[in-house]
Amino acid sequence: MTLFSYLVSVAENENFSEPERLGQLAGRLLPKLSQQQRWSLGWLGHYGVGMLFALVYVHLWRSGKLKHDLLTRIWLGGVSGIIAVAVWKATFKAHPRPPALSYDKYYIQLVPAHMVFALFAGLGYQMLNRNHHCILNKSEYAKINR
């Protein structure tokens, strides 16, 4: 997903990197942060949200609420992208010093970026699921989620 955003950034000649935007927003709220701290916060936030999305996907697949197929992964990514657009819009609106940015282009690229993320999250899930000792099977998962 992040690579997708970087590629769109190059094509549009504008920075759409989510971790860099998060770091920029943090730095504008806390100007005493060093560049390294801003960078770290941006990446930590970006990966943290990515982990939350991935955990939701795994829950939906493990519980049997959604199929684990290509179409479902694309759909999950699209829904995740729409959620991301809403969260980013709210974040930029609430921030006292939002960045100068082509917001429409930024929001539009978030949807396919999240589709890419969901496709690769599904691929990772599929690869890990082949090793039964790595991930709980459905009956074990159901027991701990009662």
What are these regions (language model features)?
Residues 1-146:
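Short amphipathic, positively biased membrane-proximal segments
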